[in-house]
């Protein structure tokens, strides 16, 4: 069923949209399972074990929704006939077509995290250092707004796939757009390159993030026992790209300059696109289907709305309403207003049963906690980058490692800890903590991670040991694994049947808001007096977690059987 009014988002199918992104999971049920095997369907087993990510932030959040088709796609060959994929074991025992999606996703994550690892310092480094000399606060705000825009674009990418082009075509087009964005950053001078490049990468990343996992789901029939391992292999590619990207682009940036680093990101995306182009015809016909085609008589109005939106944005930029220094605030406002509209539309709908309406109210405190969590977590790309540049002792046996290398720590911990969390949830079964408790624990631990900066505050340049940052990022990862995949899972369980996709959009809007706030908060960070910053934000996060913990019983009562 669909809402009475035309929905701006695709209606739910068993496999839509990917966390940002946590914004890559295994189920805590013994064997690894694709995240969306349970995410696309609101089943009777609403308190089933939660998902545990095996990917970087985006893999743990934004990549989670889309592959629900794994449970229903029914593996098909290129001609659309079922069953051939069940006998194809050429890629580590998996269908050969998986290699093509594995490759394009790995290289996309390589380019995405590689570019993001050097973006902030490129913006605020002086011209003599190869940067643009931008104010540090403005630069961090741009990075935060860009990250938020990626998650907003994920919603758009899912809609285009569901209503216009199908997942595979959107994936392919998005990869081209991403490559063009990295080329713009590497070739176009100054702020022109930044503006064009970041817009293209944000739009392309949202489209690819929303559909790659869904395409993987079409490679397997519902009964194929290889599906779980196939998704685990796919998410290994995500982590591999996220790990290698900052290492190699950062190394090239320190040796040859920023534009060489951006150029390497473009080369990586080009390699992924080339290998995918050769193999995309081998993908199942199911991957190219348009689940809910937009009626022909509605396409022109939709195009008109899109053009009007673009013209409005251009006018706002030209008139100075949207500026680099308030970009993060703009994305925060857009995300907040969108979320408010979604909540109002859903909660006032007559199509909701009393139980469904209660569950939506139960989602509200989880939504707010998610915003608070991502506001701190995503600062590893803003404040932590500045801290690593100014305060971290990056000397390794007399050689100074690039700033961006710090971004490669988190993917390693996710690979290691995801298996640990899966084992814990499997061992506990139904005795594991409820979702509100996990959310509160995530917020408290995230706040504690900020407090861990305090013993090293007040020092000069190179005063913080590298192992200290490694330890703090370990705590970041523990907090992420408690909230990111769990949040995506519970969102689908709480979603009313008539507004399933809109609820998923709300979860992504929480990530978009949090990521943008992470950029906005940087204006309060003072390198030489960082104690108040870490102290206040740390205690705010802990307070949010404690409040939710105290509200666990009433929240669970609103959730009506969903744990």
Positions of the model-derived regions?
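C-terminal ends and interior cores of transmembrane alpha-helices
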Residues: 176-190, 444-461
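Transmembrane alpha-helices of Major Facilitator/SLC transporters
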Residues: 335-344, 399-429, 442-449
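Glycine-rich segments within core transmembrane alpha-helices of 12-TM secondary carriers
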Residues: 228-246, 253, 268, 506-518
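Hydrophobic core of transmembrane alpha-helices in multi-pass small-molecule transporters
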Residues: 181, 192-208, 462-482
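Intracellular loop-helix junctions on the cytosolic face of multi-pass helical membrane proteins
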Residues: 17, 25-27, 32, 37-94, ...
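Short amphipathic helix-loop junctions that connect adjacent transmembrane helices
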Residues: 117-138, 382-403
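Conserved MFS/SLC helix-loop-helix module at the cytosolic interface between two early adjacent transmembrane helices
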Residues: 154-177, 183
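Central cavity-lining transmembrane alpha-helices of secondary-active solute carriers
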Residues: 143-159, 408-421
């Amino acid at each position: 069923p669909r809402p009475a009014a035309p929905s701006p988002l695709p209606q739910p199918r068993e496999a839509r949209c990917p966390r940002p992104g946590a914004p890559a999971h295994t189920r805590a049920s013994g064997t690894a399972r694709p995240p969306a095997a349970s995410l696309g369907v609101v089943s009777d087993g609403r308190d089933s074990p939660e998902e545990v990510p095996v990917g970087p932030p985006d893999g743990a959040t934004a990549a989670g929704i889309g592959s629900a088709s794994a449970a229903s796609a029914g593996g098909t060959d290129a001609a659309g006939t079922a069953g051939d994929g069940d006998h194809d074991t050429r890629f580590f025992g998996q269908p050969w077509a998986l290699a093509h999606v594995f490759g394009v996703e790995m290289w996309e994550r390589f380019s995405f995290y590689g570019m993001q690892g050097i973006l902030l310092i490129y913006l605020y480094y002086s011209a003599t250092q190869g940067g643009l000399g931008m104010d540090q606060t403005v630069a961090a705000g741009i990075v935060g707004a860009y990250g938020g825009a990626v998650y907003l674009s994920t919603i758009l990418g899912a809609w285009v796939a569901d209503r216009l082009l199908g997942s595979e075509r959107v994936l392919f087009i998005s990869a081209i757009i991403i490559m063009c964005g990295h080329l713009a950053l590497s070739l176009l001078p100054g702020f022109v390159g930044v503006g064009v490049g970041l817009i293209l990468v944000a739009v392309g990343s949202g489209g690819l993030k929303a559909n790659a996992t869904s395409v993987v789901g079409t490679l397997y029939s519902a009964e194929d026992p290889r599906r779980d391992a196939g998704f685990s292999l796919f998410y290994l590619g995500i982590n591999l790209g996220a790990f290698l990207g900052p290492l190699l682009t950062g190394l090239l940036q320190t040796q040859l300059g920023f534009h060489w680093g951006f150029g390497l990101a473009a080369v990586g995306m080009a390699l992924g696109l080339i290998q995918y182009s050769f193999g995309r015809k081998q993908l199942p016909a199911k991957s190219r289907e348009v689940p809910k085609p937009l009626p022909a008589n509605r396409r022109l109005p939709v195009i008109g709305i899109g053009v009007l939106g673009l013209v409005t944005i251009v006018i706002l930029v030209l008139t100075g309403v949207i500026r680099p220094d308030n970009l993060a605030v703009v994305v925060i406002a857009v995300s907040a207003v969108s979320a408010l509209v979604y909540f109002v539309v859903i909660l006032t709908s007559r199509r909701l049963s009393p139980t469904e309406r209660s569950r939506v109210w139960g989602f509200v405190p989880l939504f707010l906690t998610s915003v608070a969590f991502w506001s701190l977590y995503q600062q590893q790309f803003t404040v932590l980058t500045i801290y690593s540049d100014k305060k971290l002792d990056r000397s390794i046996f007399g050689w100074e490692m690039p700033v961006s290398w710090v971004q490669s720590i988190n993917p390693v911990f996710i690979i290691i800890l995801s298996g640990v969390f899966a084992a814990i949830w499997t061992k506990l079964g139904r005795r594991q903590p409820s979702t509100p408790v996990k959310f509160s624990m995530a917020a408290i631990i995230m706040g504690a991670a900020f407090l861990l900066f305090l013993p090293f505050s007040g020092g000069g340049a190179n005063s913080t040991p590298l192992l200290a940052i490694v330890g703090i990022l370990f705590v970041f990862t523990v907090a992420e694994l408690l909230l990111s995949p769990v949040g995506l899972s519970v969102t689908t369980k709480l979603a009313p049947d008539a507004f399933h996709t809109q609820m998923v959009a709300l979860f992504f809007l929480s990530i978009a808001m949090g990521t943008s706030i992470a950029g906005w908060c940087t204006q309060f960070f003072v390198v030489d007096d960082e104690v108040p910053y870490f102290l206040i934000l740390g205690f705010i996060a802990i307070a949010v977690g404690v409040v939710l913990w105290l509200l666990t019983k009433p929240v669970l009562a609103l959730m009506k059987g969903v744990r």
